[in-house]
C-alpha cells in the first residue's frame, strides 16, 4: 500500500524548494548578460582609443605634409593649413623690332636702330606667404645677357589698412608703371614712364581703406633717376648719396560696389615724390655720377640727353615729381590716362662759370582699349573667355588698342648756346608718339602683341631742324606662368 503520509510530506518539500531553485537559476541567468555587457563595454573603449590615436597620428602627419597645387597660372607648394606657401612663376617676353626708316637723311641725328630679335624679359621667380602674415617675392631678370634683380621684398600684412614693405620694389608713383608687365596693353610703356622711377630700395607703408575704395602708399627710398632703377646706379642697388626720396600715392575707386554699375570701373589718383639730389664730378670735371638720365623712344633710341664729357650737367638740388592719373573700364572698353610733371635742379660748370636752373619737364598719355571678343576690360588683363583648346572651338581673346603720348622738355635746357645744359643737335625738345596695336591672347598663358609706333620730334637735328620720325613695328611673344 502506498504511504500517503510520506508522499504528502515529499510533495510539500518539493513545493517549498521549487521557488528557491527557480530564483537561483534566474539569478545565474541575469548575471551572465551583465558580465557580457561589461566585457563589450571594455572592448568598445579599447577600439575608441585606438581610433583616437589613429586620428591624432593622421592629423600630425597631415600637418607636416606639403600640399602640391598645379594650375594654368602657377605651380605651388603649401602647408596643410595654407598659411605658408611658395609659388613658382615665370615671365618670358621674346620681341622683334623692325624700323621702317633704317637710314636717317644726311645731317639728321637720331638714326633708328637695327632690325632684329631680342629677349626683352626672362624672369623666373618665386613668391609666397610665410605663416599667413609675411608675403615675399624674389624676381631676377636674365634678359640682355646679364642678371638684374628686379624685385626682392617682403610685405608684413598686419591688417588690410596696414602693410609694411621692405626691400626692392616699384616706386609708388606712376599708374602704368605699377601695372604688371603682363597686364600692360602695349609692348612698351608710354612716354610719361620716362620721367618717373622704376624700382627702388627702401620701405613702404600702405593699405586699403573704406572697404577698398581708397588705397595709399607712403615710401622712404634711396632714390632713382627718371625712368631708372636702383640697379642702374654707379654702384648697382646701392645709394648714390645720403639724400632720400619721399614718395606718396593715393588712389580712389569711389564707386566700387556702387549701385551705379557703369561707374564701378572709375579710378582716380595722384602720386609724387620729392628729394634733394647732388651729382658729383672728379678732378678733371667729368661726372662720376650725374644723377640725371637720358630719354629713349620705345624703339630704344635716345632722343634727349644732358651734356657730358668734362663739363657735364649734373643734378644739383631739389627734384620733385607729381603725377595725377585715372582710368575707366566698362564692359569691353577701357581708358587710361596719366600726366607727369618733373622739376629738376641742375648745374653745369664751365671753367670759372657756373650755370644753375630748375628745369620743368612734362609728359602725358591717353590710351584706349577694346575687346572684340567681349571680355571685360580692367586694370589687370582678363583671361580669355574662350581660350584655345586643341580640338575645341575657342581661339582666345582679341583686343584692339590705341595710344597717344607726349613728352615735352623744358626749353631752358637748350638756352645758353655752348653753355646750355644739353646739345640741341641730338636732343629733341619734344617727342610725340602715336601707337596702334592688336593683342591676341591664345590662353591665359600665351599672348602675342603687335604694335606700330610713330614718334615725331621737335628739334634734335643740325641747324634746328626736326629729327626724322621714328617708325617702328614691334612684336612680342609672351609666356607667363
Q: What function would you assign to each model-found segment?
A:
Residues 2-3, 31, 262, 272, ...:
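Outer-membrane beta-barrel pore domains
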Residues 2-4, 25-93, 101-105, 251, ...:
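N-terminal periplasmic/intermembrane-space "pro-region" immediately following the signal or transit peptide
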Residues 112-142, 209, 213-222, 325-343, ...:
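Surface-exposed extracellular loop regions of Gram-negative outer-membrane beta-barrel proteins
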Residues 71, 84, 111-122, 148-150, ...:
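Residues that define the transmembrane beta-barrel architecture of outer-membrane proteins
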Residues 77-86, 133, 161, 173, ...:
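Short loop/turn motifs that connect adjacent beta-strands in outer-membrane beta-barrel proteins
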Residues 104-110, 159-251, 255-260, 280-314:
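Surface-exposed coil loops of outer-membrane beta-barrel proteins
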Amino acid at each position: 500500500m502506498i504511504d500517503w503520509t510520506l508522499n504528502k510530506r515529499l510533495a510539500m518539500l518539493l513545493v517549498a524548494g521549487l521557488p528557491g531553485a527557480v530564483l537561483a537559476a534566474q539569478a545565474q541567468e541575469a548575471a551572465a548578460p551583465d558580465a557580457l555587457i561589461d566585457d563589450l563595454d571594455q572592448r568598445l573603449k579599447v577600439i575608441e582609443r585606438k581610433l583616437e590615436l589613429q586620428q591624432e597620428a593622421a592629423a600630425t602627419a597631415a600637418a607636416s605634409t606639403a600640399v602640391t597645387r598645379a594650375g594654368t597660372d602657377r605651380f605651388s607648394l603649401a602647408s596643410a593649413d595654407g598659411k605658408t606657401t611658395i609659388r613658382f612663376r615665370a615671365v618670358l617676353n621674346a620681341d622683334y623690332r623692325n624700323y621702317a626708316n633704317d637710314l636717317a637723311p644726311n645731317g639728321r641725328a637720331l638714326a633708328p636702330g637695327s632690325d632684329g630679335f631680342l629677349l626683352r624679359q626672362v624672369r623666373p621667380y618665386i613668391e609666397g606667404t610665410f605663416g599667413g602674415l609675411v608675403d615675399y617675392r624674389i624676381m631676377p631678370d636674365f634678359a640682355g645677357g646679364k642678371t638684374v634683380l628686379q624685385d626682392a621684398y617682403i610685405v608684413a600684412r598686419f591688417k588690410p589698412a596696414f602693410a609694411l614693405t621692405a626691400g626692392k620694389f616699384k616706386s609708388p608713383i606712376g599708374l602704368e608703371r605699377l601695372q604688371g608687365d603682363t597686364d600692360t596693353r602695349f609692348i612698351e610703356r608710354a612716354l610719361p614712364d620716362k620721367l618717373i622711377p622704376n624700382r627702388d630700395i627702401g620701405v613702404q607703408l600702405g593699405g586699403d581703406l573704406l572697404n577698398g575704395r581708397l588705397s595709399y602708399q607712403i615710401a622712404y627710398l634711396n632714390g632713382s633717376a627718371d625712368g631708372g632703377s636702383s640697379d642702374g646706379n654707379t654702384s648697382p642697388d646701392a645709394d648714390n648719396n645720403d639724400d632720400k626720396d619721399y614718395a606718396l600715392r593715393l588712389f580712389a575707386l569711389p564707386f566700387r560696389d556702387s549701385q551705379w554699375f557703369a561707374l564701378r570701373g572709375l579710378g582716380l589718383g595722384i602720386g609724387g615724390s620729392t628729394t634733394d639730389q647732388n651729382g658729383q664730378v672728379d678732378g678733371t670735371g667729368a661726372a662720376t655720377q650725374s644723377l640725371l638720365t637720358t630719354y629713349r623712344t620705345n624703339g630704344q633710341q635716345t632722343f634727349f640727353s644732358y651734356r657730358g664729357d668734362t663739363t657735364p650737367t649734373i643734378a644739383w638740388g631739389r627734384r620733385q615729381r607729381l603725377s595725377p592719373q585715372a582710368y575707366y573700364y566698362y564692359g569691353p572698353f577701357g581708358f587710361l590716362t596719366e600726366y607727369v610733371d618733373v622739376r629738376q635742379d641742375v648745374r653745369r660748370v664751365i671753367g670759372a662759370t657756373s650755370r644753375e636752373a630748375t628745369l620743368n619737364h612734362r609728359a602725358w598719355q591717353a590710351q584706349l582699349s577694346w575687346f572684340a571678343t567681349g571680355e571685360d576690360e580692367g586694370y589687370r588683363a582678363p583671361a580669355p573667355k574662350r581660350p584655345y583648346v586643341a580640338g575645341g572651338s575657342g581661339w582666345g581673346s582679341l583686343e584692339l588698342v590705341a595710344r597717344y603720348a607726349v613728352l615735352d622738355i623744358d626749353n631752358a635746357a637748350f638756352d645758353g648756346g655752348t653753355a646750355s645744359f644739353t646739345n640741341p643737335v641730338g636732343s629733341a625738345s619734344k617727342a610725340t608718339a602715336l601707337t596702334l596695336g592688336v593683342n591676341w591672347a591664345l590662353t591665359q598663358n600665351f599672348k602675342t602683341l603687335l604694335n606700330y609706333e610713330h614718334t615725331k620730334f621737335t628739334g634734335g637735328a643740325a641747324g634746328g631742324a626736326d629729327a626724322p620720325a621714328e617708325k617702328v613695328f614691334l612684336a612680342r611673344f609672351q609666356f607667363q606662368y
